[in-house]
Amino acid sequence: PSDKWTEQELQKLEKRLADVYKQAGKELDGKARNYFKQFSRRYAKEYAAYQAGKYTKKEFEAWLMNQYGRGQRGEALREDMARRLTESNQIAAAYINEKTPLVIALNHNFEAYMIKSLMPDKQIKEIGDIAFNLVDEHTVKRLTVRKQKILPPRRVLKSKDVRWNKKKLQNALLQGILQGDSIKKLAGRFRDVTGMNHTAAIRNARTAFTGAQNGGRQAAY
């Protein structure tokens, strides 16, 4: 029963995480489209010149990188987008930390109940009754604190996370340019970076739930 409940709670959490990154993805897509839209006419003009043989492929790619990848506005865009993704990661970590104490509590209580149910009455009298009560929120949090070595809370190091996301956004843009993506496709590449963050959050949630489940059971002994 505790396994089934834990899995159900994990599915609920994963849905919440999906909503977080879906919203972030929409916002990033809008920012990227607005940014690239400002250069659409210039892009069309330069692309036509490139097609006419006035530029080599490397020269055209260099122009694109100067426009999109290295300019001040491009840097500001990536900084803004990276911070938005880091904000989503912080929200995801908070959701995970909010749920794991309850997973600890239920698995702790269920394990304690199972231990008691398997003990002979004589042994229970010798060692004292094992109380089976649902742990309230405050007790659960205290239990989590005591078990931090087993189950440390999820934390997002903001500056490190922002740097990581900026690098991934830059790489996505570079790959798009090298592969000759249209402006629309360039904007869409940023969604892949959102997907990376979403995947990492799901992985963190599953790891945290497994740790909470095991930690709760161990605490019953």
Residue ranges of predicted features:
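Acidic, glycine-rich two-metal-ion catalytic cores of nucleic acid-processing enzymes
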Residues: 192-221
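N-terminal leader/targeting and assembly helices and adjacent pre-domain segments
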Residues: 1-195
